[in-house]
Each structure stands twice: as structure tokens, then as C-alpha cells.
Amino acid sequence: MSTSFENKATNRGVVTFTISQDKIKPALDQAFNKVKKDLTAPGFRKGHMPRTVFNQKFGEEALYEEALNSILPAAYEEAVAELELDVVTQPKVDVKSMEKGKDWEITAEVVTKPEVKLGDYKNLEVSVEESKEVTDAEVDEKIERERNNLAELVLKEDAAVEGDTVVIDFVGSVDGVEFDGGKGDNFSLELGSGQFIPGFEDQLVGKKAGETVKVNVTFPEDYQSADLAGKDATFVTTIHEVKAKEVPELDDELAKDIDEEVETLDELKAKYRKELEATKETAYNDAVEAAAIDLAVANAEIVELPEEMIHDEVQRAMQEFMGNMQRQGISSEMYFQLTGTTEEDLRKQYEADADKRVKTNLVIEAVAKAEGFEATDEEIEKEISDLATEYKMEAEQVRSLLSPDMLKHDIAMKKAVNVITDSAKVK
């Protein structure tokens, strides 16, 4: 095989390579055996046409396309490897010559991975807003949330205050005309919860059961229903019941009701503190990692990012997201319907930071290469086991979905992230 590469622009060029006769002849034989199954000729049964008869009738050239399709992928990969090119997109292939008895000449327009010139990526000084410290107030707040979850609603005769729950009927209208979705019966509404549009709940504070109130509000300009956005509306609202939230005493009995594994309130506080410390430790480490990687990327120099890489990253991110949705039993159609968004909205969301994600991956890959990181067999097996556990799959299923090269790449990337993060110093 002869190969050459002609640079056309930054990160773009043309690979020229030949496919030799020792590869072409077996491919032609294979192509003939495939197509002859459906061919007939006078004096021969279907599928038994001799090669000489085929060549006389159709010409050997009729097999070229089928033969090329079978050998082109491997030939292209061999050429790229020989030229030591790091290609990032599918090539645009063109056949230059396919003459009988001669080597075939092929060209492929390719986009190559940008060159990354690493700056400092070790011992970086970073600052993060997250704190690992857990305060008494945070522990108390967590217990208070659980305490409120155990609260009971008790009927009251007094006027409603914020935090009370009212049971109401309501009928909404704009300019005296009722609108779809503006009516409800025996609806339970916690005042101050923000369930309804701004101003609605405030006008029920101070009211008692049995009262009927005209609640005047204005729909937000960005309201989901365009027909109502920005318009004034009146809701005739009848209050049937007012209920106060009665929370249990903050004592050892409450602690046992919240968590059967503890006996006292102090034990519950200690357990919650430990849980919060673990959560904040993770958040802190994630913040340090993000800050360190961002700085390593900022310190690096990347020569012109190809648009194709950004496009591919958007596609990858969208497919990954929708795949996660499907694993939760939510189809793409259902997701867009539930969120009131479109595929184009999702695309724009991922396009917003695709450039950053691609640059980040390139820098991490460059660090892995600079450090000479590789994956051992033991590390590959552990990665497969971890993925199988995470996605509730059999190890063999993971092996069938991920190639060894992909696993090795992911492990090397993790090592690179660790070398950036572990050496970082927080200001």
C-alpha cells in the first residue's frame, strides 16, 4: 500500500492510498460468489453461472463496487494508521482509479484532531465556593424538613395564615370569559407554596372557611399558555376549609419516627451530620475538579476547533440524554410533551457549551498522552464490573457494548483527570 497526506487547511486534508491486487482479487471472488446466487444463464442452474460467462455478459467491472465496499474500511484504517493521523470524523471518500489488473487509487477528505499545546496542568491553584463544613443550622434544617413531612393538617376556624392549607373551588375568567384549565373543585392549596401564579395565594391569607373571594391576578409574560400570557384575570374562589399544619414535638420519639435506626434525637443529628458531610465532601471535590480542569483548559492552546467535532459532540450528548430517558421508561416524544420543548430546543441547549466540552476532552486526552497513561487488564475488568453495577447489566453485556479500545481510553482519561485534580491546591 502506498499512502500520502496533503494538508488543505488547518485540521483538514486529503489522504491518498492504494489497494493492491492481492487484496482486490479475493474481494472480487467474494463479490462474485455473493451476486451469482441470484443469477441465471442458459444451460446453467440458478446460482451456478461460471465466472467467465459473468465476465462476458456483465464485465468484471460490475463486481467492483461490491468488492470495494468489502475492503475499503480496512484499507482506509490501514492508511490512516500508516500516516499516523488522528481522524475525528467520517471521511468523504472518492475513487480515483479502478483499472483491471492495477492497484485501485482512493482519496479520502478527512478532518484531523486539533493540536493541543499543554500549559500548566499540575499543582494548579483554584478557588471554590463550596465548603466541606456542616453547620448545626444545616442539620436542624434537614430535621425540620422531615418534621414537617410528618405534620398533620387540622381544621381551624380562624383566618388562614401563610403555611395553612385551604380547600377551595375556583373559576377563572379573562374579561368575563371563562378559559380552559381555569376551574377547579376541592383543590388543596398550601398558602405560600407558590403553586399558583404570583399574587393568588396572598389574597387568600386572612380569609376564613365559607368565604367567597374575587382574586385578581396578572398572568406572567412568559406563562406557558400564550393565550393567557400577560393578561389580567379574576378567579372567583370559595374557601371550604382552612387547615393548620400541626407538627410533632422535636424529641426522641420524633427521631424514631423519622428513622427507625436511631433511638434519640442526638443520634439522628449525628447521623444527618455524617450524611451531610459526605454530600458536601462530594460537592466540594466535584467543584475542585471542575475548577482545576477549567484552568488546565484555559492554560492550553488549541489550534482551531473543527465545526464537525462540535456537531458530533452535540449529537453524542443528545443521544446520551435521550438514552437515559428511555432507560427510565420515558420516550423522546413523551419527554418533549411533558417539558413543552422540542428536539431543536434540546439541541440548542447542548450547543451552548459543546465548544467547552470538546476542548476539555482534548486537553484531558493530551494530558493522558503526555503522562503515558495506559490501562491494565485488571483496570479494564474493574471498569466493566463498575459499569455493570451502575447500569444493572451483566458484565458480558457491557463487554459487547464497549470495545477494549474505548474502555482503555476512558480509563486513561480518568487517570488524567486525577492527576490534574489531585495535585490542585485550593486557595
UniProtKB/Swiss-Prot annotation:
Reaction(s) this enzyme catalyzes, per UniProt: [protein]-peptidylproline (omega=180) = [protein]-peptidylproline (omega=0)
Superkingdom of origin organism: Bacteria
Gene from which this protein is expressed: tig
A Pfam family it matches: Trigger_N
Name of the protein: Trigger factor
Record has Repressor as a keyword: no
Domain notes: Consists of 3 domains; the N-terminus binds the ribosome, the middle domain has PPIase activity, while the C-terminus has intrinsic chaperone activity on its own.
Keyword Transmembrane helix among UniProt keywords: no
